[in-house]
C-alpha cells in the first residue's frame, strides 16, 4: 500500500491438462484480490474471486488478468458484490480486467455486481482479446448507489477484439461529474442497474443472431463476426440478473 492507495494484481492461467480437463498453472492473488479454486464441472475449471478487503477505495488500482489456452475451459465468478467506496486517499480508483482466450479455449466470466457507493470515484476498464475460434460468455453488472443513497461517479469502458480486430469499444460515465444526460431518457432513464452480456461463439459466424428487443429495457445486438451483445437496464440488481439470465438462455 502507498499513500496513493492499494495496488493489487490477480492472475489466472488455464490450459488443457491432457486428460480432457483444465489445469490452472497460474493462480496468483495479492492483497484484496484473493483467488480460490472451487469444484470443477466436467472439463471446466472454476475459480472464485474473493475480496479480502473493502474496496476499491479512492486511489486504489486493482488488476485482474485471465489467460485461457487452446482446449481449456475456465469459469470465473466472485464470492460477493464489489463495492466502490470513498477512501482517505484522494483521487479516482481504477479496476482493470484483462482477458485473453486462444482458439479452442472457452471463458465464462460471471462475477457478481459492481456497486458504486455514494462519494466514490471509479474507472473500470475491461479489455478482451480473443483468437478466432475462441468462446466467451462475459457478464458485467453495475448498480448505482446502495439502497437509499445517491451513486458515486462510475466510468466504465469495455473493448472486445477478435483476431486483432475491434468488434466493440464503448464507454459510459454515470453519477456526479459525468457528462450531462446520463440519467435522462436517452441513457439510463432513471434506472439504477445496468448490465451487458457479451457472447462469442464460432457458430454465430454461420448463423448470426437476430437483433431484437428483450422486454422493455433490454436489447440483443449482433456484433461483427461471431459475437453478440445484450444491453439491459433495470430498477435493481435482482431484476437485472433475471433479464440477463433469460437473455443467455435464449441464445441456447
Swiss-Prot record:
Pfam families: UreD (PF01774). Signal peptide: none annotated. The keyword Magnesium does not apply. It comes from the Bacteria. GO terms for cellular component: cytoplasm. It is found in: Cytoplasm. The keyword Chaperone applies. One of its GO terms (molecular function) is nickel cation binding. Keywords: Chaperone, Cytoplasm, Nickel insertion. Transmembrane segments: none annotated. Required for maturation of urease via the functional incorporation of the urease nickel metallocenter. UreD, UreF and UreG form a complex that acts as a GTP-hydrolysis-dependent molecular chaperone, activating the urease apoprotein by helping to assemble the nickel containing metallocenter of UreC. The UreE protein probably delivers the nickel. Belongs to the UreD family. This is Urease accessory protein UreD. It comes from Streptomyces avermitilis (strain ATCC 31267 / DSM 46492 / JCM 5070 / NBRC 14893 / NCIMB 12804 / NRRL 8165 / MA-4680).
Amino acid at each position: 500500500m502507498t499513500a496513493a492507495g492499494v495496488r493489487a494484481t490477480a492472475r489466472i492461467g488455464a490450459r488443457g491438462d491432457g486428460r480432457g480437463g483444465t489445469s490452472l498453472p497460474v493462480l496468483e492473488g495479492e492483497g484484496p484480490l484473493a483467488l480460490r479454486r472451487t469444484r470443477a464441472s466436467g472439463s471446466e475449471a472454476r475459480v472464485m474471486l474473493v475480496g479480502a478487503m473493502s474496496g476499491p477505495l479512492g486511489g486504489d488500482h486493482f488488476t485482474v488478468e485471465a489467460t485461457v489456452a487452446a482446449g481449456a475451459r475456465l469459469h470465473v465468478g466472485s464470492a460477493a458484490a464489489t463495492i466502490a467506496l470513498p477512501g482517505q486517499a484522494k483521487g479516482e480508483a481504477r479496476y482493470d480486467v484483462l482477458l485473453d482466450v486462444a482458439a479452442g479455449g472457452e471463458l465464462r466470466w460471471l462475477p457478481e455486481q459492481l456497486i458504486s457507493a455514494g462519494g466514490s470515484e471509479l474507472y473500470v476498464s475491461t479489455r478482451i482479446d480473443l483468437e478466432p475460434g475462441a468462446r466467451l460468455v462475459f457478464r458485467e453488472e453495475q448498480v448505482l448507489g446502495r439502497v437509499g443513497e445517491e451513486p458515486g461517479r462510475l466510468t466504465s469502458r469495455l473493448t472486445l477484439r477478435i483476431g486483432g480486430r475491434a468488434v466493440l469499444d464503448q464507454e459510459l460515465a454515470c453519477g456526479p461529474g459525468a457528462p450531462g444526460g446520463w440519467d435522462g431518457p436517452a441513457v439510463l432513464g432513471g434506472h439504477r442497474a445496468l448490465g451487458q452480456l457479451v457472447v462469442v461463439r464460432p457458430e454465430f459466424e454461420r448463423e448470426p443472431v437476430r437483433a431484437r428487443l428483450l422486454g422493455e429495457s433490454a436489447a440483443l445486438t449482433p456484433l461483427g463476426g461471431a459475437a453478440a451483445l445484450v444491453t439491459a437496464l433495470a430498477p435493481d440488481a435482482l431484476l437485472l440478473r433475471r433479464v440477463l439470465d433469460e437473455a443467455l438462455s435464449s441464445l441456447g
